[in-house]
Amino acid sequence: MIHLKKIIFFLIFSILVSCSSIPKNTQNSCAIFEERYLWYKHAKASYEKWGAPIHLQLAFVKKESDFDWLAKPPRKKLFKVIPFKRPSSSFGYSQAVKGTWEQYKRETNNPLATRVRFKDSVDFIGWYIHKTNKILRISKKDAYK
């Protein structure tokens, strides 16, 4: 019974996630939030929880994945022709690698978080900025360090 519920959950989740597309204008945060109002709510919630500025969260997503929810690093080429392994396990909006993502899920007690959900990705970015601030003493508002 539990196995069936998991399958149904992942089928519904897959259908809903596949409806996501890249915003039309990724250069303008106001245009992004006009097009995707829930993204603003998620980014604001991450700001309130972790103190990571919304503009910095969007800068991370823009730089890492250009708002492509299925972004992955390009494959290496074998003999300069045959697609081979990817250089890392980074994936999704935040391009979080698997190990760091697992640490985030453990520390935030959020085992259902996925790298393809914008909500989870901006929460991860907020958590990451918060951890960086705590450990390295880099300002949460400093996008250049």
Language model features with spans:
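Enrichment for repetitive, rod-forming helical segments
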Residues: I12-F13, A71
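Catalytic glycan-binding domains that act on GlcNAc-containing polysaccharides
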Residues: S21-K145
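Hydrophobic transmembrane signal anchors and adjacent membrane-proximal interface regions, especially
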Residues: I2-H3, A45
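Sec-dependent signal peptide recognition
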Residues: H3-I12
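C-terminal motif of bacterial Sec signal peptides marking the signal peptidase cleavage site
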Residues: V17-S18
